[in-house]
Amino acid sequence: MCQFISWVEEDNKPYYLDNKALKTKEGKSLLKYLRDNDSLCDLQGHGALRRYYSELKGRNQECTDFSTPENFPKEIVNSIKNMEMTNILFGDETPLVLLNSEGQAEYQKIKQSALAEYKKIKQPALWKLFKQEKYRNKLWI
């Protein structure tokens, strides 16, 4: 699976998705397609890019190394700095290096609090659904 950030490079220009693109008719259609196919997690990948920019013939590119903005095209750097990619999902790795040490500590507090809440409801949620036969795997009916 492709990672955040992916782009297609054609004629030395990066084509990528941002919040503005997702608000267009084509962007809304892309989101609907991904939701309908239970693949919203693919939003940051080349498949979504190729669907949105179907006319492009350029080369697939991606980078997950956020240690320096120099690893990315300047257009993408500007989009990140201007908070224009907040609706594009991260892959498995959240780029905490975007935050300074104080921001990372705050992020970890938020994450731990959310994880604690999730752990409280995880098992009861499973059994609540399992109780209903329509949600059970056929092998467990």
Residues of each region from the PLM?
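Short, glycine-biased loop/turn motifs at secondary-structure junctions and
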Residues: 1-141
